[in-house]
Amino acid sequence: MTPATAEVKVGGRKRKNDEPVFIKTKQSRSARREEEKENLLNKSLPSTPTSSEAGSSRESSNPVTSSSRRKNPPTKLENIQKTLPTCSDGLEIRNYVKKYGLPEDNKFLVRNVFDKQLLFGKKYVCRRRVIKSIDEFFPRLKTDAHRENGLYNFCTLQFMKISSWGSSMDEKIYVTSAAIVQSYVIIVDDNDSVTCIENGISVIPMANRTLPSISYNSSNVKNITLTGPELKKAKNVYLAVIVKRKTPKLGENRVGTRGKSTRASFETAASSENFQQLVRFGCTLMYDKDAEINCLNDGVQRIILLDREEKPAYLKIFGKADEPELENAWMNNVKHLEFISDTNYNKEDSHLARLIFSSNTHNYFDRPDISKFSPWQPRSRRTTLKSGISVEPGTSCDEDCGSQYEDTITLKQLLLGTKKLCGRRKRHLTRLTSRWPCFSVDPTKINSYFNETGVTLLENSCSYRPGTQRSIPIKPTRVIRVREETPVSVPIEVITIEDDSDDSPCFSARNRAPGGTRKYGLDFIQSSGHMPYIRYVYMNRANDLVPQLNGEENGKIEGLMEAYPMNNAHMYSDIEFLRKEKLNLPKNAQKYGEMTILDYPLTKTETDEYNKKMSVMNVKDFAVKPRKPIPTVGNTTLSLDLEGCPISTFSEIFFPSGKTELFNILCRHFYSEAGQRPGCFSAQWKSRVLTGFINKYHQYIFDMKLNSLFEKQINLIAMVSPDWKLEDFELPMVRYKQLKKEWKNRQRDIPSSN
């Protein structure tokens, strides 16, 4: 809309009317949007009187032209003399107050004027304030309230279901279809003094479906809180319950249950005169410091509900039904608690009444040794192991433990947190690291190999070791690091966990590269599974056994995707079989003899069993002529049956592989020590491994005349390597010839025995 003047014809001449007439003109979409935004802004701003130009703080933005005929241009906002500077700096405000002599009380008003000018000038970014719901900060308020009262969250109990106790239940009447559970947490200290904490009442439906809509003032979820002394001195923690329900009396008809149901009929039926109350008791051990039992975080569990009239011992403990004041007296006796708790260890409880509940902790009792934790002291940060084991840092060592760290510590002791480990030793056991080699080799005496006459199976002597067996504890050390971003003259001490690693691959860190750098993030995968399963990434380590290439200080970092023999059932079955059956080779088959096939001899029991199966064999197909009666053959050989036919057995072929087996022993020993093998890697790496092998075992190779086997191994690897080059062949071969020449020179210097 644009304003225009209306022309009126008066006395033959035209004159312009003073009142403007708005003529509708076309506007673009963007112009209309800008006009709407401007109108909204004008509506949101408070209207203030602008009688004079000097007193106005801003200019009106309404697009209405004045009816005045003066030709003076309109006054702009920036040309108006400002009463206050448009800056909210505290120093300028202070100078302004001193300059004009304003009182101190006006500082607040002056700052408001500054903020208002910045707000109207669109220099402030205003956001709508979102009020948080009470559910977001209610847990924090609850925790603060517990801290003010000296309480600590112990565990959370949720009573879920009652099984095998639903007799005489009518789902239409809530009195019989629900049970009331009164739970208690009983704490026993070192002096066998009992502290009983009541948890309130829970209502549990007897059927799977929910109860009718009745207003219960109880909840099935109970948050147990304890004070600091109770939490520190707890030796045993029991959970005791008293479950009550009602059943209709025998021999009496329930009033008002037939015909049309009314409110009066339900009230009459629910009266205590028509029902009898049943009471059951139960108790279970949740925590025991001495026996290292911790069931506070075991999830879903059950408590066997006992009837006082089931056994005379129960009647003596719980008292008679006409003595309700003695229902809680048994909780103060430690022997009664132990006796009732032992009934929960019965596994055949499918026919017994039981209460199903779940338990969850707040990480206070994740270690069995609760006595080490004092709630009155600030909780230190926990150290998480790479295997998923959490160990609390120790404080001090009360006894001398100089040589205790060198003792062998099993993973079971580390997981259970045994009390035999003192504080200093526990502080050392803060992390596990992998131990090389990943596979073990059975100890074999190479020198006495040719003197043996029995069969020695060496093919499967290299067995895989799981991660839990090749994990060793390492202790933390104090290191000094200097941060690069801050120039510090005195180095900042930061206590971290470092490896006591040397050049040996057995003590190298899993994320340490040959150059001493560490791999983090996706370059090195940490343990993410549950304990004690450990994930490993096999990387090329700093290894003296594998020489570096010429002109290189550090070798190339390569990821080794090796596959080790795991879960090899055939290998273990062979080992177990050879442990029981010992064979002796004939002289013509010993070590350097001809190829020989040996049959494992059968025992008399196996032969009799085989003949028995043949004698009772039934032929179901009558079209086939049945077997003839087995003739009696006076056979004295165990390898033949009654008919004189050989009985099938196991056999094994032996080749003249004396030198081959000895060479394999040397290779396996080297691969296990170096942690590498020249299998499926680059040609450069294969060449370096072969060079390291001849460097270490050249004395055995030349003494046992295994030269041809090493040369054959080089040629074989060269044939199966597509990227094999002349340089890769010359690296081990030149070293082999050099060592052979030195060995021959030493042999010449040795005087002959003749």
Swiss-Prot record:
Basic and acidic residues composition bias: residue spans: 31-40
Keyword set includes Cell cycle: no
Keyword terms: Developmental protein, Nucleus, Repressor, Transcription, Transcription regulation
Region (Disordered): 1-83
Annotated knockout phenotype: RNAi-mediated knockdown results in ectopic expression of the homeobox protein egl-5 in the head region. This ectopic expression of egl-5 in the head region is enhanced in a nfya-1 bp4 mutant background.
Tissue spec: In adults, it is predominantly expressed in the germline, and weakly expressed in intestinal cells.
Highest taxon above the source species: Eukaryota
Transcription found in the keyword field: yes
One annotated Gene Ontology cellular component of this protein: nucleus
Outcome of mutating C283Y: In BN21; temperature-sensitive allele, which produces fertile progeny at permissive temperature (16 degrees Celsius) and sterile progeny at restrictive temperature (25 degrees Celsius), probably due to a mislocation into the cytoplasm
Coiled coil ranges: none
Biological role: Component of a Polycomb group (PcG) complex. PcG proteins act by forming multiprotein complexes, which are required to maintain the transcriptionally repressive state of homeotic genes throughout development. In association with the nfya-1-NF-Y complex, may play a role in repressing the expression of the homeobox protein egl-5 in tissues such as the head. PcG proteins are not required to initiate repression, but to maintain it during later stages of development. The mes-2/mes-3/mes-6 complex may participate in the global inactivation of the X chromosomes in germline cells.
Protein name according to UniProt: Polycomb protein mes-3
Organism in which the protein naturally occurs: Caenorhabditis elegans
Recorded name of the encoding gene: mes-3
